[in-house]
Amino acid sequence: MFVCRMPMPQPTLPTESLAYALQRAAQALESVQKGMALPQALAQATTQCPPPARAAAQDLAYRSVRRLGSSRALLAVLVKPALQARVRDILLCALALLQDAAEDAAYTEFTVVDQAVEAIAAQRRTVAAKGLANAVLRRFLRERETLMAQIASQPEARWNYPAWWIDTVRAAYPDEWQALLEAGDSRGPMTLRVNTRRVSVAEMQAKLSLAGMESEVIGPVALRLAQAVPVERLPGFADGWVSVQDAGAQLAAPLVLGENPRAGMRVLDACAAPGGKTGHLLEMADVQVTALESDRTRVPRIYENLERLGLAADVRIGDAGTPSKWSGGGWDGVPFDRILADVPCSAAGIVRRHPDIRWLRRADDIPALVAEQQRILLALWDTLAVGGELIYATCSIFPSENEAQAQWFERVRTDAVRLDAPGQLLMTPGGAHDGFYYARFQKR
């Protein structure tokens, strides 16, 4: 006689539970480890999530990516056999939470262990590992100090960066490398740029205060919030009163335009998406801005930002290094008075906002980026008017992309005169800005 056994139904986790958020965060973490950027990985993993669950999964995923080096090292000590990818990633997320517990106890340790086991038990393909998961996490809690000391000798575990990244920063900044790595592992502040065409800085600060949001003036039009909030809660955001932009990035537009920008001046914002610097240029002066972006999927963001701010630019699609192929018939041959060359780079200076960058980048990416930056610089220089200025900008802290590039450009372009500029800006723990680099050249 044959007995037909129906498969046990798969448990459904409440969307408000930590177990549910752990599943979604683990899915995103798996994608990051396969090479996908964290925002895209989260978008895929949380498509069907209600907003509170999406926010919880996002918080977990960002924590997990920031602690990926130490969590991987811990798991290698705690579990010898290879784990299923989903079991591994739920445990990595749980270990990140437990490591953060001392300084930021988002959940009790008991809750983390219990809900991690629930997340594993709720999936048919992983349920067999629930006992192992329970044992692994409880052992970590019992032996935390010993285990953390055991992995501390591994640079990737100690600093939560790839070894090549640590070596690069240490070589470039022998006296500051530890502070730089720590700063990159922190959470950056939420900084606003006030659109003074719509409202003064003092008025905006007062409106924020009335809405229960404390802020500090940290630049000519920069307000740093004491606590980050969703943008839709910002007074006047939909009406273009403010934009979210790091204080370091807010240096670009004033550097491009100078103290007395001429009305109608032709300005090229190369590599313009999502349009933050384009908007700032137009907020500051009545200039003609061409916003160029090579990735057509990012161009809608430029239009969205300009529409919200009530501003307009000539938006083009194309590679900054091939002006003849820009959309709209290519460059029209009329030289630009100012060019902002915010070139593709490693993004090593904004790692505290994008912690996945450290794990997605490879050491051999840097020479390729350096070559691309040089190609773009040379091409854009040919579109600059005599007497005009080009600002070279990156969001990197690696000297090969920054000062080395500025010195190279001075050597190969004898018609380039280097002018004063901020140079290298470094992030610091609790600092007001991310890592940026600015160099300025005038064409003679």
Question: Over which residues does each language-model region extend?
Answer:
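S-adenosylmethionine
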Residues: 1-444
